[in-house]
Amino acid sequence: MKLLVKAPAKINLSLDVLGKRQDGYHEVKMIMTTIDLADRLELMELAEDRIEILSHNRYVPDDQRNLAYQAAKLLKEKFNVKKGVSITIEKTIPVAAGLAGGSSDAAATLRGLNKLWNLGLTIDQLAELGAEIGSDVSFCVYGGTAIATGRGEQIEHIKTPPSCWVILAKPHIGVFTADVYGNLKLNRVTHPNVDKMVDVINAGDYKGICDTVGNVLEDVTFAMHPEVARIKAQMKRFGADAVLMSGSGPTVFGLVHHDSRMHRIYNGLKGFCEQVYAVRLLGERETLE
């Protein structure tokens, strides 16, 4: 039996770090929303008891470093599944980009194998399992728009922001989240107003959303990789309604309401950035249907 599953990327409309926890993780408060840029996974049941990862993308590991592999392994061990699975990952989301591509692949694997192996788990149970794999996996199981707290695994759903274009530009570098957090000095950064962002999203206030976007990690990544700051400045000059770095970077996104301006910004960015995408916000949460 074979199953196709979609794994959408996420952006952070607001990201704050409150402090470091005793377990070594950072306490965060952020708003994430899924966008229509997605990897596609094909899950095929194997009679033999093994996990196989296949991808044409050379940056996708085919062993337990891969979060989709970890998701399959977790389900096999927790529920004593004796069958195997072959997971083919068609990558569209850039790797190490701040868009939760690996986490979304893991979440899609959890949802898909729940169906393929007839495990009968609820989406809440899958999200709880996702937290054992990575901080963003719980959110990616649900999708939609949510406030994430704790280390990112505590999810509270909120309304979907008004529909708009999201233009993404990723420079030809990868950023490691641990390096960014390691250089973060909480008393030297600008903290965004996450609560205000919740209010303007719930009010459907597009201008308010654009005025309130913020990411506490931006200055850290900009200092390490000045080219990320240059992309943000360029996107602003081209006329995006709001511009922000997603996650720990290096991808920068712009929110744009009008089609004509979206095309102008997209074409302008293609002139000096290799990976540029224009996609829409995804309004709906995932279901198990």
From Swiss-Prot:
EC number(s) from the headed UniProt entry: 2.7.1.148
Catalytic residue positions: 10, 136
Binding positions (ATP): 94-104
Example of a GO biological process term: terpenoid biosynthetic process
EC class: transferase
Keyword ATP-binding listed: yes
Pfam families: GHMP_kinases_C, GHMP_kinases_N
Function noted in UniProt: Catalyzes the phosphorylation of the position 2 hydroxy group of 4-diphosphocytidyl-2C-methyl-D-erythritol.
HAMAP family, sorted: IspE
Record-given protein name: 4-diphosphocytidyl-2-C-methyl-D-erythritol kinase
